[in-house]
């Protein structure tokens, strides 16, 4: 029996929006550093 290729993600051939996910990653990283700076009393 041949196995059918079943994927939960639609195979449309479109490129993933790397700019979108990179923007969110950089935003979350910036917020993370802001919280860390506040925690270590670098900013008041």
From Swiss-Prot:
It is found in: Cellular thylakoid membrane. GO terms for cellular component: photosystem I; plasma membrane-derived thylakoid membrane. The keyword Membrane applies. GO terms for biological process: photosynthesis. Keywords: Membrane, Photosynthesis, Photosystem I, Thylakoid, Transmembrane, Transmembrane helix. The chain crosses the membrane at residues 23-43. InterPro entries: PSI_PsaX, PSI_PsaX_sf. The keyword Transmembrane helix applies. It is a single-pass membrane protein. Belongs to the PsaX family. The cyanobacterial PSI reaction center is composed of one copy each of PsaA,B,C,D,E,F,I,J,K,L,M and X, and forms dimeric and tetrameric complexes. This is Photosystem I 4.8 kDa protein. It comes from Nostoc sp. (strain PCC 7120 / SAG 25.82 / UTEX 2576).
């Amino acid at each position: 029996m041949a196995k059918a290729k079943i994927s939960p993600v639609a195979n449309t051939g479109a490129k993933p929006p790397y700019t979108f996910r990179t923007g969110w990653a950089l935003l979350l990283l910036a917020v993370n550093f802001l919280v860390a700076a506040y925690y270590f009393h670098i900013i008041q």
